[in-house]
A protein has these predicted regions:
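Extended, non-globular alpha-helical segments
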Residues: 1-11
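Glycosyltransferase-associated regions of secretory-pathway enzymes
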Residues: 8-10, 20, 117-119
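Glycine-rich catalytic cores of cysteine/serine-nucleophile enzymes that process amide/ester linkages
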Residues: 12-70
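Aromatic/basic micro-patches that form nucleic-acid/chromatin recognition or nuclease catalytic surfaces
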Residues: 61-103
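Activation targets extended, charge/polar-rich intrinsically disordered C-terminal tails
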Residues: 87-147
Length: 147
């Protein structure tokens, strides 16, 4: 039997090559794309999910790979997002990374189109930062500085 994911770590970032695309100019800096990380405690396995123009990308990650991603994303934003099981009758929405992540975590708002709008809506609804501990950011892991 499989494991039904109860929470995702949703990240928002801007890759170095995003500046090459003129159509991304209107998106807020640091919020050009979003994806998700999930952990299966039964298999002790991390899963990375991302929707791109090439299709859906899914990777299973080892501990070093997940450490590298979490350290890289430290300079951007990552939220803990419990999955909602709200049923929606009519969900016509464009298919991009934002709408895909919203469906993944069961978050439905018709007016959200950009990664930054999604981030702001999640924060407003009480979702918390993965990196925050008692209102402060954790120290970056000094043993793996990939910037």
């Amino acid at each position: 039997m499989g494991y039904l994911q109860k929470e995702w770590l949703v990240y928002f970032y801007e890759a170095p090559y995003h500046s090459e695309y003129d159509w991304m100019y209107f998106l807020k800096k640091g919020f050009k794309h979003c994806g998700a990380l999930g952990y299966d405690p039964h298999q002790k396995l991390w899963t990375h999910l991302e929707f791109t123009h090439e299709g859906t990308a899914m990777e299973h990650l080892n501990q070093k790979e997940i450490d590298d991603i979490i350290n890289y994303m430290y300079d951007f934003k990552m939220l803990r997002c419990p999955v909602r099981r709200d049923w929606q009758l009519f969900r016509i929405k464009d298919m991009n990374c934002v709408s895909w992540i919203m469906r993944l975590i069961g978050y439905h708002r018709w007016y959200i189109f950009t990664p930054y709008q999604l981030y702001c809506a999640l924060i407003k609804d009480g979702y918390s930062s993965f990196y925050n501990t008692n209102g402060q950011k954790k120290e970056k892991n000094s043993r793996t500085d990939n910037r």
